[in-house]
């Protein structure tokens, strides 16, 4: 039985991971759960899974959880120190790590697991978007086993040969007969909405994805298609793809999760209902297929498939991400940081929906390119970009 750490345990991916673990209790012992501040939810998880360790990034939440655990006669060790969490991830208490902390906040923990040579289930796309070559170099150096969890990258992975699956980050796509990776996206809730109405879009409208049940941040990213842009960058690094080997296709039904086109004209697609428990079950099962607890795809009830090219006037964030992808790690780090600030501001109704892309572009244009030498350097750039975005909001974009 493997020892599993779940980072982002109280979020959407954490929920789905724990659901799959419930269906397959013989596979994993959950030894570490990490979250930000959801004390009541974490208490319930401690009751059910009895992890050895719990990490809360909020000191106040950690203190509250300690008191509740004591009152309930539960003996989990509660941490509120990031360094201790990083040490635990590298220890013998952990074999496998579900890296599902949203945003740049998950970079250090994900890299700690990689550096320690752990089996890493990568659900935090921002970590790879920011660190790119540094991340892949760390995987190669440590020998960590990297499994893509995002439904699209998981679909691509399943459609590749075993040789390519075993060379994540250094794939020779052309040498193995791959012509192109076809990355699908639904187009979000505003695929048909008139562009003239975009400025009036509310957070409540934007978080209602037509097919997927997700957290607020990723739902907004799906509405702007920044999420697909981040996935484009992630695919570039995971599969060592060049610009000619990556294509984004709008597929509103979200049944085909991505495809791989081969040189002989064949296209291999991975399909299934839009439920994250399916790719999570795939990575948790490793070499075997396991129960995900989801319904099978009903081909007789499934909608007709449709495909179209993305409209960059409708999705300017997608264009910004594609352009940043091959400009270097500084650009992708700034893109991600500025977007996180912009999405938070939109959710707080401080800026308009249309100002998300405007803000990201302005922050990108403020910074000159520079060579990235370390993760610490990346985090400095990340901080600078966040400050720039916040200053622009205060100065120019208050609704």
Swiss-Prot record:
It catalyses: 2-C-methyl-D-erythritol 4-phosphate + NADP(+) = 1-deoxy-D-xylulose 5-phosphate + NADPH + H(+). InterPro entries: DXP_reductoisomerase, DXP_reductoisomerase_C, DXP_reductoisomerase_N, DXPR_C, DXPR_C_sf, NAD(P)-bd_dom_sf. One of its GO terms (biological process) is isopentenyl diphosphate biosynthetic process, methylerythritol 4-phosphate pathway involved in terpenoid biosynthetic process. It holds the Pfam family DXP_redisom_C. Belongs to the DXR family. Catalyzes the NADPH-dependent rearrangement and reduction of 1-deoxy-D-xylulose-5-phosphate (DXP) to 2-C-methyl-D-erythritol 4-phosphate (MEP). This is 1-deoxy-D-xylulose 5-phosphate reductoisomerase. It comes from Psychromonas ingrahamii (strain DSM 17664 / CCUG 51855 / 37). The lineage of its organism: Bacteria, Pseudomonadati, Pseudomonadota, Gammaproteobacteria, Alteromonadales. The gene is dxr.
């Amino acid at each position: 039985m493997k020892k599993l750490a779940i980072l982002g345990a109280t979020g959407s991916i954490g929920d789905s991971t724990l659901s799959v673990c419930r269906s397959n209790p013989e596979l994993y012992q959950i030894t570490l759960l990490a979250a930000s501040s959801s004390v009541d939810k974490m208490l319930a998880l401690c009751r059910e899974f009895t992890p050895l360790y719990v990490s809360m990034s909020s000191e106040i939440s950690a203190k509250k959880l300690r008191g509740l655990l004591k009152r309930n006669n539960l003996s989990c060790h509660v941490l509120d120190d990031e360094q201790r969490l990083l040490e635990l991830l590298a220890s013998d208490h952990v074999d496998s790590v579900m890296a599902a902390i949203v945003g740049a906040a998950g970079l250090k923990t994900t890299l700690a697991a990689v550096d320690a040579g752990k089996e890493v289930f990568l659900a935090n796309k921002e970590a790879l978007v920011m660190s790119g070559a540094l991340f892949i170099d760390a995987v190669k150096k440590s020998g960590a086993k990297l499994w893509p969890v995002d439904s699209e990258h998981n679909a691509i992975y399943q459609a590749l040969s075993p040789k390519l699956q075993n060379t994540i980050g250094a794939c020779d796509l052309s040498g193995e007969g791959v012509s192109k990776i076809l990355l699908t996206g639904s187009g979000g809730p505003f695929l048909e909405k008139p562009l003239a109405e975009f400025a009036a879009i509310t957070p409540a409208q934007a978080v209602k994805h037509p097919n997927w049940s997700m957290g607020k941040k990723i739902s907004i990213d799906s509405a702007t298609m920044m999420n697909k842009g981040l996935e484009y960058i992630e695919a570039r690094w995971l599969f060592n793809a060049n610009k000619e080997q990556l294509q984004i296709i709008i597929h509103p039904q979200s049944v085909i999760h991505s495809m791989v086109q081969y040189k002989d004209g064949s296209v291999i697609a991975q399909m299934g209902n839009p439920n994250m428990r399916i790719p999570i079950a795939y990575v948790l099962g490793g070499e075997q297929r396991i129960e995900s607890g989801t319904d099978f795809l009903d081909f007789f009830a499934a909608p007709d498939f449709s495909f179209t090219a993305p409209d960059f006037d409708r999705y300017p964030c997608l264009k910004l991400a594609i352009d940043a992808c091959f400009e270097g790690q500084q650009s992708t780090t700034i893109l991600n940081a500025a977007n996180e600030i912009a999405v938070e501001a939109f959710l707080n109704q401080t800026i308009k929906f249309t100002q998300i892309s405007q803000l990201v572009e302005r922050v990108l244009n403020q910074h000159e390119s520079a060579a990235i030498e370390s993760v610490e350097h990346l985090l400095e750039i990340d901080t600078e970009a966040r400050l720039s975005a916040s200053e622009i909001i205060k100065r120019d974009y208050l609704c």
